[in-house]
Amino acid sequence: MRSVTTGQDRASDLALGLFGSCAIGVMAKSPRPGFSKTRLCPPLRPEHAARLSAAFLRDTTESVLTAAGVAPITGYAAYAPAGTEALLAPHLAPGTRQILADGAGPMPPGVDGFGRSLLHAIQGQFAQGHSAACVLSSDVPTLPSLLLAQAARSLLSGGPRRVVLGACDDGGYYLLG
């Protein structure tokens, strides 16, 4: 369940030197059989993989909204491809905003593949007026919301070159901010 941000929470944030808000975009695609969590098939059947994807999206976006109750965070689903908003919406926590992250448009040289979508998501969140932005894997439904609040506060309290990374044991990252 999402907590409610109080005026006292916001006053605390201002006292800590936190200005603005941090966007956290869960990288998402609509959970459809044959299109989501395909590396799990087999042993899962495509419809089971899609249901698992839907549950992960709901739980991960709920975690972002819970973190928003204790830190200046706005939750997004950074989705692709364009035109799938209506398919994605029922699988998100209520109040989660959507932002297109399909990697279309001009990109700096060397930004390819999924990196295009990550950069597009970050650019889109900054375009919404946020002071800081993160992208978050949809594969972390049990990530404590406290870690998201800490990441947001760290980004908002630093200078323009502040970075937050959530490293995975496999060498990848679950959070980039």
Show where each model-derived region lies.
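Short aromatic-hydrophobic micro-motifs that form the base-stacking/packing surface
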Residues: C134-L136
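Short phosphate-binding loop-to-helix
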Residues: L87-A132
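Short glycine-enriched loops at secondary-structure junctions
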Residues: M27-R32, A80-T84, D169-G171
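Conserved donor-nucleotide/metal-binding helix-loop-beta segment in metal-dependent transferases, i.e.
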Residues: P141-D170
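A short, N-terminal amphipathic alpha-helix
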Residues: S53-P72
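N-terminal nucleotide-binding beta1-loop-alpha1 segment
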Residues: M1-L40
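Short, high-confidence coil segments that cap the C-terminus of an alpha-helix
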Residues: P72, H130, G159-R161
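Short beta-strand/loop segment that forms part of the nucleotide-sugar
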Residues: P72-P81
